Amino acid sequence: KEGIIDNKNYPFGKDKIQIKFPESIKIGLTQEEVLAIEQLDLTVGSKEWHTRNVWLLSFYLAGIRVADVLETKWEDIQDGRLRYRMNKNQKVVSLKIPDKVLTILSYYEPYRALNGGYVFPELKGVDEKDSKAVLAAIRNANKTLNKYLKRIAKLAKINKNITMHISRHTFGNISGDKISVQMLQKLYRHSSITTTVNYQANFISKDIDDALDAVIDF
């Protein structure tokens, strides 16, 4: 692409040599581990308390991505629903706001003006028309949130690497066989149901476990 080598002589790409990268292992938290996080006695207003709120809100709303969480504004919340446009694919999403999310929102509602209209304060003061500045702020915030999530994991005695993105995997893990793949596709806003099936395959293991037991339990 940079003109360093003629495309005809470039050995990689479509219909040529293709490098296959190993599948990443997706690990989500269990229901018990989420409960442990929920039940932590954290000081109101502390970094850990705030980080837990951001992470749980993401999880409660079907694992919405960190950029979408941090860019959520109060004006996006109307009639008991969150309506926003996904950063990744620009699809419009409308989700009912669960009671647990309403509780989190109540902590931040008094600061809506101070936070520049955002639910969370990470993007206050950032020029939203400057996409590079917004992206940089989100990356920095994500790094900070992940740092405090490590502390939360330690406090909750969870031996897993918890990150903001793990909230999405956690939703997938807990939803398991509880929700149809068609409904999960809508919640995730995947373009193809195949994408949803492949994603959930990382977490749904009951059928495999039952099949294994059926063979060796004699």
Feature locations, PLM:
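Catalytic-site neighborhood detector that most strongly recognizes the C-terminal catalytic loop/helix
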Residues: 86-90, 125-126, 188-213
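Short pre-functional
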Residues: 52-65, 174
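N-terminal DNA-binding recognition helix of tyrosine site-specific recombinases/integrases
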Residues: 1-11, 62
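Conserved tyrosine-mediated DNA breakage-rejoining catalytic core shared by Y-recombinases
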Residues: 14-15, 61, 71-107
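Active-site/catalytic core of tyrosine-dependent DNA strand-transfer enzymes
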Residues: 33-34, 98-159
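Short, polar N-cap/turn motifs at the start of nucleic acid-interacting alpha helices
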Residues: 75-81, 158-160, 179-198
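Long, amphipathic, Lys/Arg-enriched alpha-helical "connector/arm" segment
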Residues: 19-50
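Short, basic (Lys/Arg/His-rich) helix/loop patches that form interaction surfaces
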Residues: 39, 43-46, 146-186
